[in-house]
């Protein structure tokens, strides 16, 4: 009953609408703050953000159950929602860092410096470790318990996706760990861009491994369909981001912590 089409459709619409509404409302409050000043819009944005964090925590986990975990119909994991959430966190902070660096190099974000990128690098590092923790916890518990209904999920990936399975795990853990452990590497724009590209590739492979074995079984390949979908959604993402960036100033005017952000130093 949970996965019947009407209820599934209603949940999917609720997720997307909730995320869309929160983003639009936060943007509107930020622009209103630029025009009016004061603390009213700022306090409203804080309240909305606090509510949205709770909503996103629940909705992102349920989205993972509905859109990904349900592909392997008879398998479930109570960690799966957090596993997907941590992957979303890594890729989200990675894209923020990479876009910020590109805009900085183009001269659009003159206030951004290595201190701001350092903070983003710490978030990328932290979420990479969180992703690894979730990955290992899920894997170890299922492997140790050795329950047939659970191990089938990993057997399908070991038997037919073995190389990609281990390469993905190494890329998403070892690479960020070794490169971003030091302070200097998190402050280096070139390092962050390089790590960002590798991390995005690694988490694309992670999504591929979550979906493809349940859909194609052993008959899989990375061909024009997979690459085309990736390029298509990347193009759509860049179109939406560029369109949004072109419609508003890239730096706030009346935010109470604007000066503190400009002079941020760590």
Task: Describe the predicted segments one by one.
Residues 5-168, 255-258:
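Long, contiguous internal "core" modules enriched in hydrophobic/ aromatic residues
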């Amino acid at each position: 009953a949970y996965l019947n089409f009407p209820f599934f459709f209603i949940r999917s619409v609720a997720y997307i609408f909730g995320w869309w509404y929160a983003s639009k409302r936060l943007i509107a409050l930020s622009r209103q703050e630029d025009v009016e000043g004061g603390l009213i819009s700022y306090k409203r944005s804080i309240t909305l953000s606090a509510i949205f964090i709770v909503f996103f925590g629940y909705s992102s986990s349920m989205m993972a159950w509905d859109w990904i975990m349900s592909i392997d119909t008879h398998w479930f994991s109570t960690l799966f929602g957090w596993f997907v959430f941590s992957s979303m966190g890594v890729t989200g902070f990675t894209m923020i860092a990479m876009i910020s660096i590109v805009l900085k190099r183009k001269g659009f974000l003159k206030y951004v410096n290595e201190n701001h990128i350092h903070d983003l690098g710490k978030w990328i590092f932290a979420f990479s470790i969180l992703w690894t923790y979730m990955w290992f916890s899920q894997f170890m518990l299922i492997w140790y318990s050795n329950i047939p209904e659970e191990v089938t999920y990993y057997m399908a990936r070991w038997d037919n996706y073995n190389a990609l399975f281990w390469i993905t795990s190494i890329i998403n853990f070892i690479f960020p760990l070794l490169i971003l452990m030091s302070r200097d590497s998190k402050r280096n724009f070139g390092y962050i861009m390089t790590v960002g590209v590798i991390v995005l590739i690694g988490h694309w492979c992670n999504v591929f491994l979550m979906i493809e074995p349940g859909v194609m079984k052993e008959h899989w390949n990375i061909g024009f369909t997979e690459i085309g979908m990736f390029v298509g959604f990347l193009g759509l993402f860049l179109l939406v981001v560029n369109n949004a960036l072109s419609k508003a100033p890239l730096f706030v005017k009346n935010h109470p912590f604007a000066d503190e952000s400009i002079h941020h130093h760590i």
